[in-house]
Amino acid sequence: EPFMTDTSPAKAASAEKAAEANADAATPSKSYRRYVLVVLTLVYSLNFIDRQILVILQESIKVDMDLSDSQLGLLTGFAFAIFYVTAGIPIARWADRGNRRNIVSLSLFIWSFMTALSGLAQNYSQLLAARIGVGIGEAGGSPPSHSMISDYFPAEQRGTALSFYSTGIYIGILIGFAAGGWIAETFGWRVAFFLVGVPGIFYALLLVWVVKEP
């Protein structure tokens, strides 16, 4: 007899069930997806805390370093924005091909380290360089985070997940203005940079251990 492949309905059904079981095993649980979403939202909050802190501290820095309005404007606006924009595109392309969790972690480490380093600046040029570093680091936060959230959540839940992630903006602004002003008034602007930047450095290292690349 010629060789015949067994294509019986029972075997086909068994294969389909096995495939579904493998797919379910590979799909993260609902609780883990929510957990990752909270972790990435906290990263986004740190992004905006570090971004807003200079706005809060600018008057103290202006007096301490004897800066002109044009120097202050460059420090708080253009220097950050131009590097944030130009670095964002290549980092997003990198995220399409690389490990997105590691990119988020590295970006968080860079901008947090540069924020803390701002507290050591002895002149305008050093502070400007540190803020440029913050801009480059923060450019790598959102693109890979959006991509990870899109992979973790099915299409029907993605809009809600991304909306939750966006609350990190307002959480960061709220904490930045509330805590930053008090710290600056109590301890000075240099300490404020340290206290805002250092937690992000440790959080960046922790992120590698607590989040899986989807």
Where would I find each of the regions flagged by the language model?
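Extracellular/periplasmic helix-loop-helix junction of adjacent transmembrane segments
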Residues: 55-86
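Residue-level signature of mid-helix packing/kink "hotspots" within the transmembrane helices
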Residues: 52, 80-89, 139, 173-174
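Cytosolic juxtamembrane N-terminal segment immediately preceding the first transmembrane helix
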Residues: 5-49
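Cytoplasmic helix-loop-helix junction between adjacent transmembrane helices
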Residues: 130-170
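Conserved MFS/SLC helix-loop-helix module at the cytosolic interface between two early adjacent transmembrane helices
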Residues: 86-125
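Helix-breaking motifs and short loop linkers at transmembrane-helix boundaries and internal kinks
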Residues: 66, 99, 120-126, 137, ...
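Helix-loop-helix hairpin linking two adjacent transmembrane segments in secondary transporters
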Residues: 165, 169-213
